[in-house]
């Protein structure tokens, strides 16, 4: 048992049973250890560190209720600051940090192993800290927590509550474990992973973005609806609501029965997936004076690339001659494809617009 009575004391620990007692206000004190060590409750130590920062022996360090700087070594450290607002520093190795105070800060240099921050509360990684994984300590917990990455690429994992996850600059992988999660995208390489049935989830983006296959996200939207920067948004096989901004957006629902909103600007709505009853999209704000519908001739067979010819379009419930291919029902808003006009093929609906738009072939472009 080592006791200081004031002054800037240094304690050397080489036995797991060693105990350091330091009263509050007793100087700036440090503990240097060559083995796993946890500070005693009530001992106001300012620095807990390994004796050899370049050593590769795995050493685990725990603080106490006071604020400490805790420094590992080049091995795989487990560092837990406990209650205080701690600064935790790794010197290489695959380190794990436990965060339980909003003021905790993790410092990790580039190339310092594969490092993980595990938190029991909302947490934002410090700029310049190259941590590879940021995760909530209890994935099945339902407490709402917000997680922010930094300029590096991270995997960020939420819990079963309503999380707000923002990867920031790097190409991040963001994972929700249930709850109504919100994901913020600012890198085209960001990936959102959401299992089916995991709540009502939103992806808000400042860049053009395509949802990953298999990610059951309900809403994909431009983060700033009034912005005029052109952003392209693409859904996946699930049904989504997709909302653009005031710029010229290219919006593609992918498969699934999607609800598409351009939100102003000269928008293009893309249809390039197999037609069917489960793949009928609704366009909520189509403006024939500025928006276009882009149809893929690999799906809409027989149409020539470029502007749709007037002969291939008909406004009516059914084709009226053999050249009609794209049909707009002015009464219901249904938009359909008929592969042979008045021949024997049945028309297939692929979208629903507002009724009464008085559309013409000029609203369509074949790609």
Predicted regions and their residues:
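Short glycine-/Asp-/Thr-/Trp-enriched loop segments that recur within the blades
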Residues: 55-57, 141-143, 228-229
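Short polar/acidic secondary-structure junctions
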Residues: 53, 139, 197, 225, ...
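Acidic, glycine-rich calcium-binding repeat modules characteristic of RTX/beta-roll
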Residues: 1-43, 67-129, 144, 153-215, ...
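Acidic glycine/aspartate-rich repeat arrays in secreted/surface proteins
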Residues: 266-367
């Amino acid at each position: 048992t080592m006791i200081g009575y004031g002054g800037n004391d240094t304690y050397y620990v080489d036995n797991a049973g060693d105990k350091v007692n330091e009263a509050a206000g007793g100087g700036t004190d440090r503990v240097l250890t060559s083995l796993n060590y946890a500070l005693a409750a009530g001992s106001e130590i300012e620095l807990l560190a390994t004796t050899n920062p370049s050593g590769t022996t795995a050493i685990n360090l725990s603080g106490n209720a006071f604020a400490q700087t805790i420094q590992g070594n080049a091995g795989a450290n487990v560092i837990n600051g406990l209650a205080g607002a701690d600064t935790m520093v790794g010197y290489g190795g695959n380190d794990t940090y436990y965060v339980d105070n909003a003021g905790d800060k993790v410092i990790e240099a580039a190339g310092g192993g594969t490092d993980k921050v595990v938190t029991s509360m909302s947490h934002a990684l410090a700029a310049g800290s190259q941590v590879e994984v940021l995760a909530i300590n209890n994935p099945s917990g339902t407490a709402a927590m917000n997680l922010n990455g930094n300029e590096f690429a991270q995997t960020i994992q939420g819990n079963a509550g309503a999380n707000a996850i923002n990867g920031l600059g790097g190409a991040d992988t963001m994972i929700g474990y249930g709850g109504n999660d919100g994901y913020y995208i600012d890198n085209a390489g960001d990936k959102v992973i959401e299992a089916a049935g995991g709540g009502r989830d939103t992806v808000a983006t400042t860049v053009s973005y395509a949802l990953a296959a298999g990610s059951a996200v309900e809403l994909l939207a431009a983060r700033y609806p009034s912005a005029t920067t052109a952003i392209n948004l693409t859904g996946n096989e699930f049904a989504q609501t997709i909302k653009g901004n005031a710029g010229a957006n290219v919006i593609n629902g992918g498969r699934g029965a999607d609800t598409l909103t351009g939100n102003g600007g000269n928008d293009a709505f893309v249809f390039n997936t197999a037609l069917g009853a489960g793949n009928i999209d609704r366009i909520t704000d189509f403006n024939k004076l500025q928006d276009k519908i882009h149809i893929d001739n690999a799906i809409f067979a027989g149409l020539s690339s470029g502007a749709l010819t007037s002969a291939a379009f008909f406004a009516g419930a059914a084709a009226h001659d053999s050249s009609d291919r794209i049909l707009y029902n002015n009464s219901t808003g249904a938009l359909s494809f008929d592969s042979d006009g008045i021949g024997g093929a049945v028309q297939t609906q692929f979208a629903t617009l507002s009724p009464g738009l008085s559309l013409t072939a000029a609203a369509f472009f074949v790609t």
